[in-house]
Design a protein with these regions (language model features):
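Hinge/capping helix and adjacent helix->loop/strand transition within the periplasmic-binding protein
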Residues: 1-47, 59, 96-98, 111-144, ...
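Alpha-to-beta junction loops
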Residues: 7-11, 35, 53-62, 75-78, ...
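Hydrophobic residues within well-ordered alpha-helices
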Residues: 26, 52-53, 71-74, 128
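A ligand-binding cleft/hinge motif common to bilobed small-molecule-binding domains
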Residues: 28-32, 59-93
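An extracytoplasmic/periplasmic, membrane-proximal ligand-sensing/linker region
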Residues: 33-35, 72-73, 122-184
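Periplasmic-binding protein-like
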Residues: 82-118
Length: 184
């Protein structure tokens, strides 16, 4: 942090594009940590990772599943993870929360969920929920997901809807505070 603060604008952060999760996390990091790291948007994560490996950008955030081979090959250096806990595949990496940045830890978490069209009958939603619950109870599936850096949670449709709403509100605040325009 001292280096970033001593040289505002010297370091750059590659993201898969304007308005992406990586872009929003950089904006939050700049504001929360009082640093000025330049955002360099690419056309997708592949080009952004290539830029990080090639030294075009000094900071990169990506999902463990797509970056792990580059990390293990020594082409990228992992610093921390933004996850509820340490990842099974790289238990030596601390979380951002462990490093003292809990506000950034929550923002950087990528999550996936199952959605259905509005108006889907409750019986269908419950059938899907139960099927997902059974799948997530399979130790082999949980182990496979862990190798990809995923930490399955399960839950209720209501809890997932609330998580979506909270994430949208947090992202909206970052976009407004940073003045991000999606047509940049």
């Amino acid at each position: 942090l001292a280096e970033l603060r001593a040289h505002p604008g010297k370091y750059s952060f590659g993201s898969p594009g304007v308005g992406s999760l990586g872009h929003l996390n950089l904006a939050a990091m700049n504001a929360d940590l009082k640093v000025d790291v330049l955002h360099v948007p690419y056309r997708g994560m592949g080009p952004a990772l290539t830029a990080a490996v090639g030294g075009e950008v000094q900071v990169q955030q990506d999902q463990y599943a797509s970056a792990q081979s580059l990390i293990k090959a020594g082409k990228l250096r992992a610093i921390a993870v933004s996850a509820p806990g340490r990842l099974a595949g790289m238990p030596e990496l601390p979380t951002l929360a462990e490093l003292g940045y809990p506000q950034l830890n929550a923002l950087g978490q990528t999550w996936f969920g199952l959605v259905a069209p509005t108006g889907t009958p409750d019986a269908v939603v419950q059938t899907l929920k139960q099927a997902v619950g059974r799948a997530l109870a399979d130790p082999a599936l949980v182990q496979r997901l862990a190798t990809l850096g995923a930490q399955p949670e399960g839950g209720t449709p209501q809890a997932f809807a609330q998580r979506i709403s909270q994430t949208l509100a947090a992202n909206r605040k970052i976009i407004e505070t940073a003045g991000i325009k999606l047509d940049e």
